[in-house]
Amino acid sequence: MTTKEDVSYWTLSVTILRAQNNHSQDYWSESDCYVTLRLPTASARTYQTKIVPNSQSPEWNETFNFRVHSHVKNILEVKLYDDDLVSDDLISTLLFDISNLTPGKKETKVFTTHPQTKDELLVEFELLESEEPSHEYLTNGILVAAPFSALDISIDKLLSNEKIKDMVLKLRGAYQEDIKIPNTQKARNLRFYINRDLETELGVAPPDNDNEANDVTASAVPLLSAVPLQPLRAGHEGKVTLPIGQDTVDLELQTHDCMEEGLEVRLDFDIPPQEKEYLEKRKVVVGQALQKLLGLSSPPGPKKVPVIALVGSGGGTRAMTGLFGSLKGLQQIGVLDAATYITGVSGSTWTMTSLYQQANWSQQDLNSAISAMEGEMTKRFLSSFSIDKLQYYKDEMDKKRKEGHIVSLVDMWGLVLEHMIFGKKTTSTLSDQQRAVTEGQNPFPIYTAVNMKDGITGCEAEAEWCEFTPYEVGIPKYGAFVRAEEFGNQFFLGHRIKKLPEIRIPYLMGIWSSFFSVSMTQLWQRATGAQPSWTPWLGPDVSNIEVDSEPSTLDTYLLNPVTGVAKMVTDFFKNRPVIAHMYNFMCGLFLHWNYNKHSNFNAWKDTHPDAFPNRLTPADPTLRLVDAGHAINIGCVPVLRPERDVDLIISLSYSWDPDNIFKVLKRTATYCKDHEIPFPSIDFVRLDNEPQQELYVFEDKENPKAPIVLYFPLLNVTYKEFKAPGVPRVGEAEIKAGEVDVRTSNSPYKTNNMTYSKEDYQALVELMSYNVTNNKESILEAIHRALERKESKIPQYHDA
């Protein structure tokens, strides 16, 4: 939960003394060295020493002072450069945690800047307690929200200066950093939003017209003129003199305190109140289902009801079709009403999205929904690239951009999915799905994506799980959540800065299943005859996903090559992000001084992004969201959160891993080990050498905190011989119907096959349904064990 902590202040003095360089970056001369310092938790400025020319042993003896906060993680970045006419050479980067310093004591640190040549940099530190009064910060133990204010800057005098025409006024460290100086006298003030405890830098810069997210990202273009702004108190009124060429301009400043409005980003690791209310209602439904399933004399009391989660995997159309089949089987044996959660990755989210358009879908016969989807899945997929559709995509994305959202290639993929799943435009949103859970009538849906952290040199990539429910979107790793209808809005320091229309569900589908990196590019080329403009940009960010190495089988569909509309759409994506960029609702928040002690973080690994707090997600202006299959191609992670207290996971895998059917489960187990999450101990080596089964049951009796896991891999084991549980196949037609190929290179269900024939669609639905119904007794036995374990956790004096 969000708490208040008293933050005291310290004064940090950093003196860059000297360096010893035994080798030069320059071929013909000695190095011309200088040092930069950056402490982003104290200042938005980057400080720099003078340049010492032609010296192997440069001396600076320059001191820089910072006002630092006691309760945030303060990492000083020190960079040693060699000045060069073309581009300066970075010699070394040092990251120093100032919590290693002893307050009140001067300390000289000797840093090795080149391990092979033993080059060194000497720096003197002094950390002194400030006499400033302490201040309250809001925190959840991981993130820290500093005091927030609006800053109005009067531009009357700027408007009369011709030198600033078409320029932007830039306030480093503020939100938004860049605001174009208007060419009209009507605008009297420009408003920025600031962290009152942060030193900022005000200046004038040329516009950066090529940046899609220009209003929140820091431009690489240097300031033409600048002046530092010390931290400003609430209610501050004053002026600052800004140099403009040989002239100066006085700007009036005024801050407005906004703290009384409270945070609009929920900083908490618990589930939201609305989900808790749902759980109370769902327990009644589940209790009644368990009474019927297990033949109980009465429904178990609310405290005894086990929490059962259905977990779907990725796998494109195969996963979507497969999940329909599995849900059909679960409905037939009465288990669907006993489930509390349902999660999905990639293709399985298509099934969920389709079903949750109906408020009571799990109470209705799923055969009707399956039949309706059959009509969509058996149409020619290349119809998604007709001229009319391309024009529609262009118009819709242009509308999204005008609303204020960042537009990316993933948006087009989402619109393709809209055509594929719904066959028409849908205006539904994620928050609309609240009506499907308000009475506890359906399992609670959790959609998934991951936020990619992969731009840190020398570090492994990190995929941070992001979950989407009808009530909230958030990243549990940081304990930060926003209302579903506000996802994509602009936030700073936990406060909403700009409200935007809620994103339509197709755009979210594009994020949840962005394996398009291969498939949509291939289909685009086939449909239009043109190489799409985004092809050169497809790198590991979006291509490291489950795809088939063999070429997919596509419908034959003839279109005129390189139509004008196709060119218009492909041109639309020039200079736009390839993966989904969304405004970061954690923007401006700092990390708590001991964040690295939390099991959500792997900061102990020096090659993990978690070890670099200045580069973690709160420091980013946007989230970089992709298909969760980039991390683990099955959605167990959201229901493994201890706050959800899941007792039984029914894991439904449609991942294409015929030679490694436990791949997604192995990755899940590794994730749990890294994050200290209870999970059954599984001997995968033994299982890999045993005959394959339709269902695996994993229960760790030594660890009652670990959920029971039922695992259904993508297999055809006994369905080849039985058309229904206990009913053998008879005759050539029935035997042929059982030959559903889900493992060879000739299978019609390979990931890149986006549509199926009617027969193939029905066959996969029936196979997945059979695998569930054929194992009814094992499923019921596991549910009974989950009920027993739940009851054993309840103290005897509690009344059920």
Regions found by a protein language model. Give the residues of each.
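Eukaryotic cytoplasmic intrinsically disordered
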Residues: 1, 5-9
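Long amphipathic alpha-helical scaffold regions
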Residues: 16, 68-72, 80, 88, ...
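Catalytic domains of lipid- and phosphate-ester/thioester hydrolases
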Residues: 71-75, 91-97, 103-119, 123-800
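Generic structural detector for well-ordered beta-strands
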Residues: 50, 65-67, 95-97
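Calcium-regulated, polybasic anionic-phospholipid
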Residues: 10-56, 84, 151-182
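Short strand-edge motifs at loop-to-beta-strand transitions and within beta-strands
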Residues: 60-64, 188-190
